[in-house]
């Protein structure tokens, strides 16, 4: 079966069980799939995980500047609940660049904006990116040289600012770990060196997710 037709859990289980990767895994469909009751993922560049709570939605990552709007549209087709909290897993633009679309959605609805939470290293990363704006655009175009500007991945000449002007700055940061409660849901944020040195992984201890 074509991987585009597989449920994300089915696709990941297939790879884990077989140990064989023979089809695309990191899909950019802009489509939302409910993983469990109240838990969903929008597969994009990058993905956005969404958890429903009694106080609103908790979103993990905002996707990129070219895909954030599509992510919000898919989210809104699934739920009209306000976004309570937006967590950045790290400061790369494909994970934070779509935050402007989330705040535009809030403005249209006339509700309070979400709280943005991230590791403390995200703020100096943004500052560094802004100071080296032209350089970052150049090296990313070289690194991803096979991607044409019209592919709209934010890596070509169509982008004026490496950090989009409407990117939301973190409202709350942490250093090693942070316990967060939204509604009746508990979220444990932990710092780890992953793709970056400002990486966060999120754990729901009650549901082991």
Say what each PLM segment does.
Residues 26-80, 201-209:
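Conserved beta-strand hairpin/beta-sheet module of binuclear metal-dependent hydrolase folds
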Residues 190-199:
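Active-site glycine- and acidic-residue-rich loops that bind
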Residues 58-61, 85-87, 189:
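Short catalytic-loop micro-motif centered on adjacent basic/acidic residues
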Residues 1-29:
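N-terminal pre-domain segments of enzymes
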Residues 25, 32, 55, 66-117, ...:
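Active-site metal-binding motif and surrounding structural segment of the metallo-beta-lactamase
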């Amino acid at each position: 079966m074509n991987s585009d037709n597989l449920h994300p859990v089915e696709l990941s289980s297939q790879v884990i069980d077989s140990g064989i990767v023979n089809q695309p895994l990191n899909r950019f469909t802009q489509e939302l799939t409910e993983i469990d009751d109240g838990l969903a993922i929008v597969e994009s560049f990058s993905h956005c995980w969404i958890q429903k709570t009694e106080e609103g939605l908790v979103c993990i990552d905002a996707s990129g500047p070219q895909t954030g709007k599509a992510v919000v549209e898919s989210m809104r087709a699934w739920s009209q609940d306000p976004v309570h909290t937006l967590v950045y897993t790290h400061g790369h633009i494909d994970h934070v660049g779509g935050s402007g679309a989330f705040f535009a959605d809030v403005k249209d609805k006339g509700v309070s904006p979400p709280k943005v939470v991230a590791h403390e290293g995200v703020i100096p990363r943004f500052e560094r990116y802004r100071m080296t704006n032209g350089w970052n655009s150049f090296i990313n175009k070289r690194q991803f040289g096979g991607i044409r500007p019209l592919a709209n991945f934010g890596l070509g000449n169509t982008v004026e600012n490496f950090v989009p002007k409407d990117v939301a700055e973190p409202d709350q940061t942490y250093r090693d770990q942070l316990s967060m409660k939204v509604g009746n849901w508990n979220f444990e944020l932990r710092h780890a060196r992953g793709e970056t040195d400002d990486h966060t992984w999120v754990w729901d201890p009650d549901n082991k997710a």
